[in-house]
Amino acid sequence: MVGLDSSHLLRDKILCFSSRSHINNQHKKTSYALSLNHMKLPIQRTLAFALARGKGEAESFSRLEATFGDNTSTECTWSFDFPDSKDAMSHLKSEADLSGSNGANNVASVIEKLNALRSHLLAAEKWNASQLHLCDSKYLECATNLVHYMALRSLDIEQLNSHLASLGLSSLDNNNLDVLAHLNASINLLMNDQNAVTESWTNVYPKGKSTKKNDKGRVLSYKESLLGKLREGRSTHIMVTIGEEATLSETFITDILKAGTSVIRINCAHGDPSIWGEIIKRVRRTSQMLEMPCRVHMDLAGPKLRTGTLKPGPCVMKISPKKDAYGNVVSPALVWLCLTGTEPPAHVSPDATISVQGQDFLAGLQIGDSIRLCDARGRKRRLKISKEFHVFNSTGFVAECFDTAYIESGTELSVKGKKGRRLVGRVVDVPPKESFVRLKVGDLLVITREGSLDEPSVTVPGAHRLTCPSGYLFDSVKPGETIGFDDGKIWGVIKGTSPSEVIVSITHARPKGTKLGSEKSINIPQSDIHFKGLTSKDIKDLDYVASHADMVGISFIRDVHDITVLRQELKKRKLDDLGIVLKIETKSGFKNLSLILLEAMKCSNPLGIMIARGDLAVECGWERLANMQEEIIAICKAARVPVIMATQVLESLVKSGVPTRAEITDAANAKRASCVMLNKGKNIVEAVSMLDTILHTKLIYKKSDSENLH
C-alpha cells in the first residue's frame, strides 16, 4: 500500500509510474492499490498513471484519471494491473517495515527503499522521453529534473525521510536542484562505497557529475539570461512598477536606479505606447549614463476582469496646514512652486505641488514675497516664499500656506515685483480628483456593460453603478456566487443577472465604507469562466513589447493551451531571445504549474515565474496562500526556473513612508526568490533603498537558510 502525501493540500498532476518485465514472453502482473481515505482535498485533483506497453511496442503515456470533489472525505481505492516483483513500486513497503527494524537491517531496508525510489524516478523519465525530446536543449536537464521531482512528490516518503534523518542524512525534499543526484549520494553514503551503485543507474539523458557548485552555477546562468547581472553584494534582483508619473520627473528614474532597482516593470493594462516609449527611453538613457544595467519588463494585460473607467473628478487640490486639537495652526503647509515637471530636491518633502505657467513670473519671485490668490471657493489666500532651489535648468520655490485652500487649474497668482510692477502667473496641470464609489456592507452595486453607465437602472433605483468592459463577467456568473473587488478589499454576493447587468449585494467592506474606483480587479472564484490565453489587445501589444522590452509578462496563465498559443505567437515573430515571465495568479494556473513549465521549456526563450500573490490569494483563499507560495517555489526550484515574488512587498512603506514589522520579515524572506517586485507609490525610492539594504544583509548563522530557491 502506497499512501499519497496529504501534507500538500493543492497538488499538481500526481504521477505514479511502473515498469513491465517479461518472463517467457508472459507478463507477470501484480495488483497494487492507492488509498486516499485519510485525505481531505480542497479542490479537484487528478491522478495519472504512466504505463509502458508490451515488448516491442512503442512507449506511451496512458492516463487513468479520477477526480475528487471539494472538501470531502473520500474512501476510494483503485486497483491496476502492474508488473511483477521487479516493479519499482513493489519495493516501497509499508511504514511498519522500517519501524520494526534496527541496526544493519534498518540500513539495508532503507537502501532497498532508496533503490526502489530511484527506479521509480528513472521509470518516470523513460516514460516521458518522447515529451522530453521536444524540450529545447538548454532546458532538457531542467525538464528531466522536474519530472524526477514530480515523481518523487507522488509518493508518501515522510517515513523514509524520518529514517534518513535518524541515520544522519538529509531529507529527500531538501535538494530539488538535482533530485536523482541527491538520491544517488544518499545510497552511496549508506553503502560506504561511492562507486558501487551509480555505475549501473544512469539517466536516460546522461550528464556530467552533479555537484552543489555546478547546480548553483546553472541556476545563476538561467537567472542572468532572464533578469541580467546582479548588483554587487546581492543575490536577488529588485523590480519596480512605474507608470506615467515617471515621465513627469527628470530625476525619478535616476533615483530608483541608484537606490537599487535592476528591472523596470511597465503594465500594459495602463497607459499607451507613447507613455511606454517615453519611460523606456528614459530608463535606457539613465541606465547607460549611470553604468547600472536595468532591464525592461512589460506585462501584457491579459483577460483580467476590471472595473471600467469612471468620469474624472474636478481638477482641484486641497492644501491644508497642520492644526492642533483646538484648530490652531501649528505648522504651515509647504507648497512647491515650479514649472511643469520640475521635481523638488530629494531632501524637500512638500505637502503639495503647484505648476505655474509663465517663466517670467517665477523668475521675478524672491524669498519673502507674498503671493496672493483667490481659491476655488472665492476665499482670499496667501503663499509666502521661504526657500529657493535651482534644479537642473530651472528654479523652484518652497512657499508656506497658513490657511486651507482649494486650488484649481487657471487660478491666478499675483505678486508685487521689483519697482512695484505686478507679476501674474496661472496655475496649470492640476490633476483631476480620482472618482470612486464608497461601498458599505448591505449596499447594492449594479455592474453594467461598458457604455451603459449613464443609463439609469430600472431594476435597482438608487444603487451604486460601475461598468465592466469584459463580456466574460455577464456570461459566466450566477446568483449566489461570490465576487471580490480590488484584490479582495471588497466582497459581495451576486443577487441577480441579466445580459447587461449584474446586481451585487456587498457583504464585506470597512465600517465607514471602502472606495472602489476605476480599473480595479474583479474576481469571481466560484464561477466557471473560460478565458482565452492571449486577448486581441495582448497580441497587438506583443508587437510593441518585442521591439522595446527585454521581457514580457503573460498574465492569468491557466493551462498548457495558453502556453501553446504563446509559443505560436513568439514563433511567428521569431522572438527566440525575448524573456518570458509566466504569472501564476489563478487556481488552475497553480494546479497545472508543472505541466505549464514543461510546455514552456519547448522554446528557447529565457523563462521565469511570477507569483502574483494578490489575485492568487483572492482566487484560492488567504489561508492557503503561504502553502501555495512554498509549493510554487519548490516546483520552480526543481525546474531551475527563476521566481519573481510580487504583490504588497513593503506596501505600507511605499504608500505611507512607514513599514510594518510583518513587511520587513516578508521582504527578508523574499531573498529566496530571484527577484522581488515593488509596486509604485509616493515613497517608492525609500522603499527600494530599504529593500536593497535588506537584501544586502547576510545572516551569519545557518547559511543554508539564506540560499536562493528557484
Swiss-Prot record:
**One Gene Ontology molecular-function label:** potassium ion binding
List ligand-binding residues for K(+).
267, 299
The protein's matches in InterPro entries, at most eight in alphabetical order, are given as: Pyr_Knase, Pyrv/PenolPyrv_kinase-like_dom, Pyrv_kinase-like_dom_sf, Pyrv_Knase-like_insert_dom_sf, Pyrv_Knase_brl
Where does the chain bind ATP? 88-91
Locate the site labelled Transition state stabilizer.
583
Question: Per the record, GO CC terms?
Answer: chloroplast stroma
Q: Where does Mg(2+) bind?
A: 585, 615
EC number of the protein: 2.7.1.40
Pathway(s) it belongs to: Carbohydrate degradation; glycolysis; pyruvate from D-glyceraldehyde 3-phosphate: step 5/5
The listed locations are: Plastid, Chloroplast stroma
**Protein's UniProt name:** Plastidial pyruvate kinase 4, chloroplastic
Protein species of origin: Arabidopsis thaliana
Supply the gene name: PKP4
